[in-house]
């Protein structure tokens, strides 16, 4: 059914954007501060 092709791509685009936004929020709230804290603690320990 060729008339459904644009809706398929629109659906894929919508879920792709939702996935990107979710990943961005997850990384900015949870993973990146954890990595930064690990890096700062290693830096602090090596300065001792």
Curated annotation (Swiss-Prot):
Keywords: ATP synthesis, CF(0), Hydrogen ion transport, Ion transport, Membrane, Mitochondrion, Transmembrane, Transmembrane helix, Transport. It comes from the Eukaryota. It is found in: Mitochondrion membrane. The keyword Iron-sulfur does not apply. It is a single-pass membrane protein. The chain crosses the membrane at residues 13-32. One of its GO terms (molecular function) is proton transmembrane transporter activity. One of its GO terms (biological process) is proton motive force-driven ATP synthesis. F-type ATPases have 2 components, CF(1) - the catalytic core - and CF(0) - the membrane proton channel. In yeast, the dimeric form of ATP synthase consists of 17 polypeptides: alpha, beta, gamma, delta, epsilon, 4 (B), 5 (OSCP), 6 (A), 8, 9 (C), d, E (Tim11), f, g, h, i/j and k. Mitochondrial membrane ATP synthase (F(1)F(0) ATP synthase or Complex V) produces ATP from ADP in the presence of a proton gradient across the membrane which is generated by electron transport complexes of the respiratory chain. F-type ATPases consist of two structural domains, F(1) - containing the extramembraneous catalytic core and F(0) - containing the membrane proton channel, linked together by a central stalk and a peripheral stalk. During catalysis, ATP synthesis in the catalytic domain of F(1) is coupled via a rotary mechanism of the central stalk subunits to proton translocation. This is ATP synthase protein 8. The lineage of its organism: Eukaryota, Fungi, Dikarya, Ascomycota, Saccharomycotina.
């Amino acid at each position: 059914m060729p008339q459904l092709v644009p809706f398929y791509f629109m659906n894929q685009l919508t879920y792709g954007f939702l996935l990107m936004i979710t990943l961005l929020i997850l990384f900015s709230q949870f993973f990146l501060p954890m990595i930064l804290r690990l890096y700062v603690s290693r830096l602090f320990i090596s300065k001792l």
